[in-house]
């Protein structure tokens, strides 16, 4: 399957190019979208990709787009994909309602998956969080996430996704149960998220389930950002023969 990388100058984009250099389980890099000059030397790649700032040409040259960009960039990409539908794997966070609506329109025509975190470990972490939230009905739930000091969004998209998983398991009102700034007593049907920023931490997420006399903590730590690139490529392989739909990352585990 021919892969197009959108957001190639970003941290994950560069890792995607590195993973695709020799081909990844039959995936071939066919196009790279760049707004400015690309620093990557493509002479060592198994296939010479189209490197362009022409969004329509970029989309036409591939069968699946993997996107790790910015919200406005993804919005422009979706407009091009609605004209020329291709499979989409997106890890861009902080999206506006209008962008999500365009994504839903595209999902009527092709398979796509949008996730805040593409690591296989986080996929399993979500399932464990759901089970613990469901079974430990009396436990207070608190989430702590830690990232590098250059991360722009807080709480992280992954932390918000974990919150949604826990709230759904509990049957909480997802719009009102979230607490990111607490003063005074803790309300019973609430889930807190604390965001820490410092150094070069790739990503750490911990969920605490606090009971009387004991507590359980589930934790996931990313020690290398390559897990996000490899995870996205695995998602692309999984979507290849799927029907048109917006898939959830947990569906990969059946």
Swiss-Prot record:
NCBIfam families xref list: dapB (TIGR00036)
Primary site of residence: cytoplasm
Protein name stated in the entry: 4-hydroxy-tetrahydrodipicolinate reductase
GO molecular function, one term: 4-hydroxy-tetrahydrodipicolinate reductase
Binding site for NADP(+): 35
Pathway stated in the Swiss-Prot or TrEMBL entry: Amino-acid biosynthesis; L-lysine biosynthesis via DAP pathway; (S)-tetrahydrodipicolinate from L-aspartate: step 4/4
PROSITE patterns: DAPB (PS01298)
Active site, per annotation: 147, 151
Positions annotated to bind (S)-2,3,4,5-tetrahydrodipicolinate: 148, 157-158
Enzyme Commission code: 1.17.1.8
This protein's UniProt keywords: Amino-acid biosynthesis, Cytoplasm, Diaminopimelate biosynthesis, Lysine biosynthesis, NAD, NADP, Oxidoreductase
Any Pfam family hit: DapB_N
HAMAP family named in the record: DapB
Reaction equations catalysed: (S)-2,3,4,5-tetrahydrodipicolinate + NAD(+) + H2O = (2S,4S)-4-hydroxy-2,3,4,5-tetrahydrodipicolinate + NADH + H(+); (S)-2,3,4,5-tetrahydrodipicolinate + NADP(+) + H2O = (2S,4S)-4-hydroxy-2,3,4,5-tetrahydrodipicolinate + NADPH + H(+)
PANTHER family: 4-HYDROXY-TETRAHYDRODIPICOLINATE REDUCTASE 1, CHLOROPLASTIC-RELATED (PTHR20836:SF0), DIHYDRODIPICOLINATE REDUCTASE (PTHR20836)
Single GO biological process annotation from the record: lysine biosynthetic process via diaminopimelate
Membership in a protein family: Belongs to the DapB family.
SUPFAM superfamilies per record: Glyceraldehyde-3-phosphate dehydrogenase-like, C-terminal domain, NAD(P)-binding Rossmann-fold domains
Xref: InterPro entries: DapB_C (IPR022663), DapB_N (IPR000846), DapB_N_CS (IPR022664), DHDPR_bac (IPR023940), NAD(P)-bd_dom_sf (IPR036291)
Gene Ontology terms: cellular component: cytosol
Organism name: Helicobacter pylori (strain HPAG1)
Binding site for NAD(+): 7-12, 91-93, 115-118
Localization: Cytoplasm
């Amino acid at each position: 399957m021919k892969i197009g990388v959108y957001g190639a100058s970003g941290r994950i984009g560069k890792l995607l190019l590195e993973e695709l250099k020799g081909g990844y389980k039959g995936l071939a890099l066919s196009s790279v979208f760049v707004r400015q000059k690309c620093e990557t030397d493509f002479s060592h790649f198994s296939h010479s990709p189209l490197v362009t700032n022409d969004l329509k040409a970029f989309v036409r040259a591939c069968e699946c787009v993997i996107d790790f960009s910015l919200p406005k960039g993804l919005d422009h990409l979706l407009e091009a994909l609605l004209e020329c539908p291709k499979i989409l794997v997106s890890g861009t966070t902080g999206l506006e309602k209008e962008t999500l609506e365009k994504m839903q329109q595209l999902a009527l025509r092709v398979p796509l998956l949008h996730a805040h975190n593409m690591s296989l470990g986080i996929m399993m972490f979500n399932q464990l969080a759901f089970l613990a939230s469901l079974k430990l009905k009396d436990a207070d739930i608190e989430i702590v996430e830690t990232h590098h000091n250059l991360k722009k969004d807080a709480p992280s998209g992954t932390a918000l996704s974990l919150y949604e998983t826990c709230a759904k398991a509990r049957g909480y009102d997802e719009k009102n149960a979230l607490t990111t700034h607490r003063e005074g007593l803790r309300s019973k049907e609430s889930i807190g998220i604390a965001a820490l920023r410092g150094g070069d931490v790739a990503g750490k997420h911990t969920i605490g389930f606090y009971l009387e006399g004991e507590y359980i903590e589930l934790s996931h730590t990313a020690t290398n950002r390559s897990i996000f690139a490899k995870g996205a490529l695995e998602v692309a392989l999984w979507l290849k023969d799927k029907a048109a739909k917006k898939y959830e990352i947990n569906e990969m585990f059946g």
